């Protein structure tokens, strides 16, 4: 059964920062916050808040999945090793990080095509249609059944999402 057929994220896979394939079905039964990230963005300090959510709720079946992306202002120019080092040393990130992906356009990772179709945002002139991700640190909350529950824009701080996570745990 395809991910689209059962309307969950579990049919997708992505490569971890070390290049190893990761099936999202490995996260089945967990509440997830899937985020497109960047190391040189004004929202980059949100890594700290994302890690705080992971620390707070991780033992209750929650995880953050970070997907670096260089599509917005070329704010993630580094390779996987640089990204890993930056996130771990600067923000103490221990949640799973994946290889750099595109989140919009014809080369968008299939997971992000699915996420944006399942939870469209607002259409904004010059920034794309309703399904397009507008900037770094857009967040998608996914329930324990692998269904997209809510989409949050870049300005939504991780601690503002805590109550929604709590409801799903």
UniProtKB/Swiss-Prot annotation:
<dbReference type="InterPro" id="IPR029759">
    <property type="entry name" value="GPX_AS"/>
</dbReference>
<keyword id="KW-0560">Oxidoreductase</keyword>
<feature type="active site">
    <location>
        <position position="41"/>
    </location>
</feature>
<dbReference type="InterPro" id="IPR036249">
    <property type="entry name" value="Thioredoxin-like_sf"/>
</dbReference>
<protein>
    <recommendedName>
        <fullName>Hydroperoxy fatty acid reductase gpx1</fullName>
        <ecNumber>1.11.1.22</ecNumber>
    </recommendedName>
</protein>
<dbReference type="InterPro" id="IPR029760">
    <property type="entry name" value="GPX_CS"/>
</dbReference>
<dbReference type="GO" id="GO:0034599">
    <property type="term" value="P:cellular response to oxidative stress"/>
</dbReference>
<dbReference type="Pfam" id="PF00255">
    <property type="entry name" value="GSHPx"/>
</dbReference>
<dbReference type="InterPro" id="IPR000889">
    <property type="entry name" value="Glutathione_peroxidase"/>
</dbReference>
<comment type="function">
    <text>Hydroperoxy fatty acid reductase essential for the removal of lipid hydroperoxides under normal and stress conditions, leading to the protection of membrane integrity.</text>
</comment>
<dbReference type="GO" id="GO:0004601">
    <property type="term" value="F:peroxidase activity"/>
</dbReference>
<comment type="subunit">
    <text>Monomer.</text>
</comment>
<keyword id="KW-0521">NADP</keyword>
<dbReference type="InterPro" id="IPR013766">
    <property type="entry name" value="Thioredoxin_domain"/>
</dbReference>
<comment type="similarity">
    <text>Belongs to the glutathione peroxidase family.</text>
</comment>
<keyword id="KW-0575">Peroxidase</keyword>
